[in-house]
Curated annotation (Swiss-Prot):
Lineage of producing organism: Eukaryota, Metazoa, Chordata, Craniata, Vertebrata
Cystine pairings recorded for this chain: none
Keyword match Cell membrane: yes
Tissue specificity remark: Expressed in renal cells (at protein level). Expressed in epithelial cells.
Species name: Homo sapiens
Descriptive protein name: Transmembrane protein 106A
Amino acid sequence: MGKTFSQLGSWREDENKSILSSKPAIGSKAVNYSSTGSSKSFCSCVPCEGTADASFVTCPTCQGSGKIPQELEKQLVALIPYGDQRLKPKHTKLFVFLAVLICLVTSSFIVFFLFPRSVIVQPAGLNSSTVAFDEADIYLNITNILNISNGNYYPIMVTQLTLEVLHLSLVVGQVSNNLLLHIGPLASEQMFYAVATKIRDENTYKICTWLEIKVHHVLLHIQGTLTCSYLSHSEQLVFQSYEYVDCRGNASVPHQLTPHPP
């Protein structure tokens, strides 16, 4: 009888040992789990089953069951801390800084080179003149010069010239020409234009025709508008000048190009 009880006790101890050994270790850091409908197994650093240790939480994907559906097998996302060396945060900050710096430098250069600067129009004076008379009128044909200076870092195009010539506050000549004059960046060009005038004034006629008068000059007031275009933008430049023209004979006075202002 005593022998029977001792055998029964040893059998129960062996059974308890086998039952305890089949349980997973509470402090283990990895638990195998598999997807439903698949023979593949994965290893996770966070146990899927809840434990008494406060450092572990229940896996939100498998809800502690240790298995995930097969359709979610390729949708697992690994969360990596920002300070992880695999992200190389120092290099990331450097790349962001260099990108911002390059954008700022590029923008500054674009603004500097494309910022519109002044286009200067300066009348350079009379180049030549021819005169003719009839019984009461003076026909005076003059050729003048305009110096055009482009202060921009891109070319401009002069498209139109409109002007009028006045004598004693009366319009004696008009010009309206369509042009295609190209002026390069930081360059200057000379433009010639001709105006045919007709003066009908008795006193002016006497000044130009009487031989007793030694000085045969008439004062002409020239005012005009020059239209130029650049970067899909048109600009009108106003200029004016006063010219003393010899109305007794023909004249030719060449002028040099005015240098571009610094």
